[in-house]
């Protein structure tokens, strides 16, 4: 396989760097033909195809699916808050003298978990009402 690549690579390089239009890469040939502007009738046909009721229904269905998927993060936030305060209770039961430090860490964990839930909820509302 490696020997075949060694034989083909010089031929491919010479074909790419050649000036003949026949051996140019396909991308170089197609960019020259794209300079011709398209007819206005073709553009309006494409534009009317994109605004059908089927397309609008698909867009709204995708919007609802995305909002539902973004709402799943709110449930994860609730589970995270429960885990944080459950760990606070376990830590306080093991060492009551660290009550103040454990509580400050629990509040920090609560805030971070709640922020992630609010970001997920915000994305769901943005998908529903802004797009």
UniProtKB/Swiss-Prot annotation:
Protein name as it appears in the record: ATP synthase lipid-binding protein, mitochondrial
Coiled coil: none
PROSITE patterns, per the entry: ATPASE_C
Annotated site residue numbers, Reversibly protonated during proton transport: 114
Transit peptide, from-to: 1-56
In-chain residues carrying the UniProt-annotated modification N6,N6,N6-trimethyllysine: 99
Gene Ontology molecular function, alphabetical: lipid binding; proton transmembrane transporter activity
GO biological process: proton motive force-driven ATP synthesis
